[in-house]
């Protein structure tokens, strides 16, 4: 992309698409490396489908640019939903993982470490873990499920199943006592 005449928003999105760290740093320099201005640009810049720079980094596996964005001091929105299907960057990462399992799992782990919420559902009522298909993605499934459990236990809602489903984890202690009688 020829950046001459391109807005900072367009340059940011292009840097995310192409994993172009030099372009990203040029954009940040144009904003005097001001964390508030950078965060505002990152949070408000969207392509026509509503994908942010975070979505694009996750879609194309642009780790260097994503890492630099996640390291910013400003208030970066980590779970924005795109306009088309309501996917968060974590949803997009799971889709990317179908083609690049190791790299996608690495990106997902880093998103979760900075606060991405694996419980967010898209417009099809799917959490990121619901998008996983394939035998080689067991590590990703474990990561997403573990992150959900960690959030639920931290919030004190580990006993509350969001969907209202009963989870059968085998015989209860009461059943075992009945069997002994």
From Swiss-Prot:
Annotated keywords: Acetylation, ANK repeat, Phosphoprotein, Repeat
ANK repeats, residue ranges: 49-78, 85-120
Residue list for modification N-acetylmethionine: 1
Phosphoserine PTM positions: 172
Region listing for Disordered, in residue ranges: 151-181
Xref: Pfam families: Ank_2
Cellular compartments per GO CC: cytoplasm
Bias (Acidic residues): 160-181
Domain of life: Eukaryota
Name the record gives this protein: Ankyrin repeat-containing protein YGL242C
